């Protein structure tokens, strides 16, 4: 790279280098001197980290550092005011709770349960980043927290349109984030809870039940606690979802990012034992347009099938006969009361399982492989094995071509997702 694309920044303690990579250029970061971290993951001295075009990154130092950037940046500056001390204090408070509960449970066969923290706030206030920082700090403390992702629009554990959770056993990769090994994933199939509120609520309650059962067999996960990220819908029904999620996951800490009214409302609604804290957003958080959000969802689906630069994946493409699988979806049209027999109550159409007939309309849609062996009510309650992408539909031959991580389909029950993706076969 040319000489003019090299920038060196000297950071004083408690400062942060914020930069945005250009639209068409990678940016290489190197910690030349001192100590620094990116979203809670420590940087290695003299190691080069290459961030792809359009990356938004913040490198923070507690003790001072010299950092070199090579490549074209859209912006790059040092910020002296950051909320990192607040995040560290939240982590310290969580660790104090863990230690106290461990002491209280000493000699008790019923092992201690760690703190459960819910992050809430409107869109573009940095909830996902704070979640990552707190998870990383917990891991560096020797803990293994569970990260729960309830943001179905910008999911950081699985594909968009899912409710997901993963046990965090190592700090996030500086560039690629957390490993996505053996996540628990429920298929919601939409990018906003408003598309099907009953289903969304049912799924996060099912997730809470599933995690509560699993941690009984894993003492480290139990004391590690949970860090739960939510979507940015905080008004009306979105607010009700926050309150219900806090109850379902039995949270004892709620962090409200940059929304004083939400903080005030929750302080009146949540039980007294829930510790509520209002935190300002970082000055480095940027607003994302609808176009950017859509592009990020596409990149997330692409990553699911093809991996990342550092960890390439090689999916399979093959044909599946419609006669060998059952296509279904959750949610049906609501029938008016006048269409029902006398005395019969209307069932919840939003959580009703519907068998789908093959059609050309399923092309470019994701389908989830259900763990349920039959297309029945268990589909709603079951996590999924994974996802496939329908790339072609041949109604005459009654087949569809799919992009699939596995060589063969792991389930014959395929659940529709409204998430679409045009597979361009180009590795980013």
Swiss-Prot record:
Pfam families named in the record: Clp1 (PF06807), CLP1_N (PF16573), CLP1_P (PF16575)
UniProtKB keywords: ATP-binding, mRNA processing, Nucleotide-binding, Nucleus
Binding site for ATP: 16, 56, 124-129
GO BP: any one term: mRNA 3'-end processing
UniProt xrefs under InterPro entries: Clp1, Clp1/Grc3, Clp1_C, Clp1_C_sf, Clp1_N, Clp1_N_sf, CLP1_P, P-loop_NTPase
A cellular-component GO term for this protein: mRNA cleavage factor complex
GO molecular function: ATP binding; ATP-dependent polyribonucleotide 5'-hydroxyl-kinase activity; polynucleotide 5'-hydroxyl-kinase activity
Role according to the record: Required for endonucleolytic cleavage during polyadenylation-dependent pre-mRNA 3'-end formation.
Official protein name in the record: Protein clpf-1
Gene name linked to the record: clpf-1
């Amino acid at each position: 790279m040319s000489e003019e694309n090299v920038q060196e920044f000297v950071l004083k303690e408690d400062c942060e280098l914020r930069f945005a990579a250009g639209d068409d250029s990678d940016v290489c970061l190197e910690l030349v001197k001192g100590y620094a971290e990116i979203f809670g993951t420590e940087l290695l001295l003299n190691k080069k980290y290459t961030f792809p075009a359009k990356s938004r990154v913040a490198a923070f130092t507690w003790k001072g550092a010299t950092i070199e950037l090579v490549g074209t940046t859209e912006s790059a500056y040092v910020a002296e005011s950051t909320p990192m001390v607040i995040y560290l204090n939240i982590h310290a408070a969580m660790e104090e709770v863990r230690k106290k509960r461990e002491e209280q449970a000493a000699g008790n066969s019923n092992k201690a349960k760690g703190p459960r923290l819910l992050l809430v706030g409107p869109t573009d206030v940095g909830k996902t980043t704070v979640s990552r920082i707190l998870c990383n700090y917990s891991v560096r403390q020797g803990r293994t927290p569970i990260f729960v992702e309830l943001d179905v629009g910008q999911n950081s554990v699985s594909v968009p349109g899912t409710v997901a959770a993963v046990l965090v056993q190592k700090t996030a990769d500086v560039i690629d984030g957390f490993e996505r090994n053996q996540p628990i994933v429920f298929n919601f199939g939409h990018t906003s809870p408003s598309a099907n509120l009953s289903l969304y609520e049912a799924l996060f309650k099912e997730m809470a039940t599933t995690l509560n059962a699993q941690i009984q067999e894993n003492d480290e996960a139990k004391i590690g606690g949970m860090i739960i990220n939510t979507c940015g819908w905080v008004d009306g029904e979105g607010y009700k979802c926050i309150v219900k999620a806090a109850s379902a996951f039995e949270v004892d800490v709620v962090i409200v990012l940059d929304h004083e009214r939400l903080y005030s409302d929750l302080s009146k609604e949540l039980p007294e034992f829930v510790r509520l804290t209002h935190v300002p957003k970082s000055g480095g958080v940027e607003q994302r347009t609808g176009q950017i959000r859509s592009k990020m969802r596409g990149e997330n689906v692409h990553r699911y099938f093809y991996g990342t630069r550092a960890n390439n994946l090689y999916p399979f493409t093959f044909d599946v006969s419609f006669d060998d699988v059952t296509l279904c979806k959750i949610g049906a049209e609501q029938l008016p009361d006048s269409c029902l027999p006398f005395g019969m109550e209307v069932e919840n159409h939003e959580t009703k399982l519907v068998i789908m007939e093959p059609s050309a309309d399923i092309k470019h849609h994701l389908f989830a492989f259900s763990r349920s062996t039959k297309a029945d009510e268990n589909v709603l309650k079951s996590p999924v094995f994974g996802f496939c992408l329908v790339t072609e539909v041949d109604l005459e031959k009654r087949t569809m071509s799919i992009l699939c991580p596995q060589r063969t389909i792991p389930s014959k029950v395929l659940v529709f997702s409204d998430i679409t993706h045009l597979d361009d076969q180009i590795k980013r």
